[in-house]
Regions:
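Solvent-exposed interaction patches of small proteins and small membrane subunits
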Residues: 1-137
């Protein structure tokens, strides 16, 4: 059984990071473009990690199987009807972004960051809402 406090804490991190991204990108603050990019990437990374933590918590506590890697946790959520398969696939890609950002595998493409901010923050919210609804949190 999922732990309510863990789920709520991870959802709060996701919400806070999304709010911070929208705030820093939505109004002039006297920040340089590199500062805005750094704040955005940091908060995307934190939100992605919170989503990973949320998924792995559910997979573990609900005994959905043993994922081969953290990205597979989203697939398992899809297979068990917590989220749909399309959302699971998009969240798996978010893991790839997080890995690049955290491990500096390569330079982060600002166009990818913009795409995530403009088109994929809703995926993180959808995961949070689906988990909360499924488990009555």
């Amino acid at each position: 059984m999922v732990e309510r406090d863990v789920v709520l804490a991870k959802i709060a991190v996701i919400d806070r990071c999304i709010h911070r991204i929208q705030h820093v990108r939505g109004a002039p603050h006297g920040l340089t473009p590199i500062d805005i990019e750094d704040i955005t990437v940091l908060n995307l990374t934190r939100a992605a990690q919170a989503a990973i933590d949320l998924a792995t918590h559910v997979v573990s506590t609900e005994a959905y199987g043993l994922p081969a890697d953290v990205a597979e946790s989203f697939s398992l959520l899809g297979q068990h009807g917590v989220i749909d398969a399309e959302l699971a696939a998009r969240l798996r890609k978010m893991v790839g972004f997080r890995n690049i950002a955290v491990h500096s595998y390569q330079t982060i493409d600002p166009n990818i960051v913009d795409h995530i901010v403009e088109s994929r923050l809703g995926d993180l919210r959808a995961l949070a809402a689906a988990v909360a609804a499924r488990f009555g949190v």
